Amino acid sequence: MIWMMLLAVQTVPANYDAVAVAPGSHHILMEDERVRVLRVEIAPGATEPVHDHRWPSIMYFEQPQPITYVVYKLVDGKPVETRRIDAPPINVGQTVRAEPEGLHAVSNRGSAPFVAVRVEFKDGRAVGAGGPTP
């Protein structure tokens, strides 16, 4: 998906980890040395804090809603918005692979909570139906 590829090009400092800076929307379901499984929940009308995802992942959309990705870059050590991308419609049960994502936030434009499960692969390889992806 193009909007996810646009987010993958940035390098950011460690203090923007999704769980650390956006704990209200990123809940750890399981974590070990190889994977981290997150439940992502964003209330209707809410925008989560600016954060990143350092590892490739697979996302399963449990309760998709219309969302806007807000992309940021660091300027003098502070995040500055660079663009907004209205994501294409997402279907219930849709699953996508994602590369590591740079600084961004997600706004839920829908009338119900946005809910997804993200499996992050700490070894840098997302596994899917076609096997490992380096």
Question: Model regions: which residues?
Answer:
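Mature N-terminal segment immediately following signal peptide/propeptide cleavage
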Residues: 23-51
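Glycine- and acidic-residue-biased ligand/ion/polar-headgroup-sensing regions
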Residues: 54-78
